[in-house]
Amino acid sequence: MTESNRLRIAIQKSGRLSTDSQQLLKSCGVKFSINEQRLIAHADNMPIDLLRVRDDDIPGLVMDGVVDLGIIGENVLEEEQIERQTLNKPAEYVKLRQLDFGACRLSLAVPTEFSYADASSLEGLRIATSYPNLLRRFMQQKSINYRDCMLKGSVEVAPRAGLADGICDLVSTGATLEANGLYETEVIYRSMACIIQSTQTQAPSKQALIDRILSRVNGVIRARESKYILLHAPTETLDQIVALLPGAENPTVLPLNDDTNRVAIHAVSTEDLFWDTMEQLTALGASSILVMPIEKMMG
């Protein structure tokens, strides 16, 4: 490929999505090494360039067609799209798929001594946030007037510092809120990481590479969500045992040497096989039960 046909993928330089994004691409067979002093990493085995940038720059780079793909949190993506629509700037993109990491929620939170009934309890109050557009949309939908306090970081300290009456911030476990004397009151947006593509027309060779990468991403995520199950089962309870395997599709049943009363079952399960299920399998006569992770899947 020529330089212009190299696939450019924007990922977060550092932060919660950086490691997961790199691991996903490596699991898809993209070989690269990261030099912390450089913003661009060139793949060794594919015509792919990784641009390591701030997460809030990724949506704009994709929407402006500077890069072809971006891995970004849906919260950042939605925030930037609303901002660009307000400013009449390009705001189009194609979401290729949601990923299986980066889960978080954008929530309202108030001091523990605050009496909160519903979102209308915040009428006329000042709310600190790093996501003013998502907050504004939510409050407008609820017809609630409020004052905003825009902060780029450390939003959770705003009430104690006297800067705001409450906050709207990302929450994972709630431990940070509790440490700052706050409690979560309402979720206004749930987010996962996703892959987005520019709406610009791609050269056939580049689009073929995008499709190839997406196919591998689908396979990696499907493998992560699946388990390979092997067990021995008596033929008299075979149907009951197969019915117990969660999410199993067309398990393979093989005869055992020198044992006409038992068979081997191989199955791919798309759900977790919990201990109670394994105990039920054992009660039906299953033995040698193995549950193994799957590295890759295709087809």
Swiss-Prot record:
Q: Where does this one sit in the cell? A: Cytoplasm
Name one cellular component (GO) term: cytoplasm
Q: Which InterPro entries match?
A: ATP-PRT_HisG_long, ATP_PRibTrfase_cat, ATP_PRibTrfase_CS, ATP_PRibTrfase_HisG, HisG_C, N-reg_PII-like_a/b, N-reg_PII/ATP_PRibTrfase_C
Alphabetical keyword list: Amino-acid biosynthesis, ATP-binding, Cytoplasm, Glycosyltransferase, Histidine biosynthesis, Magnesium, Metal-binding, Nucleotide-binding, Transferase
Q: Name one Pfam family in it.
A: HisG_C
Q: What is this protein called?
A: ATP phosphoribosyltransferase
Q: Does the keyword Glycoprotein apply?
A: no
Q: Which gene encodes it?
A: hisG
Please state the Enzyme Commission number of this protein. Answer: 2.4.2.17
Q: Which SUPFAM superfamilies match?
A: GlnB-like, Periplasmic binding protein-like II
Name the reaction it catalyses: 1-(5-phospho-beta-D-ribosyl)-ATP + diphosphate = 5-phospho-alpha-D-ribose 1-diphosphate + ATP
Q: In which pathway does it act?
A: Amino-acid biosynthesis; L-histidine biosynthesis; L-histidine from 5-phospho-alpha-D-ribose 1-diphosphate: step 1/9
Q: Which CDD domains does the record cross-reference, listed alphabetically?
A: PBP2_HisGL2
Q: Which GO terms describe its molecular function?
A: ATP binding; ATP phosphoribosyltransferase activity; magnesium ion binding
Q: Give the family per the record.
A: Belongs to the ATP phosphoribosyltransferase family. Long subfamily.
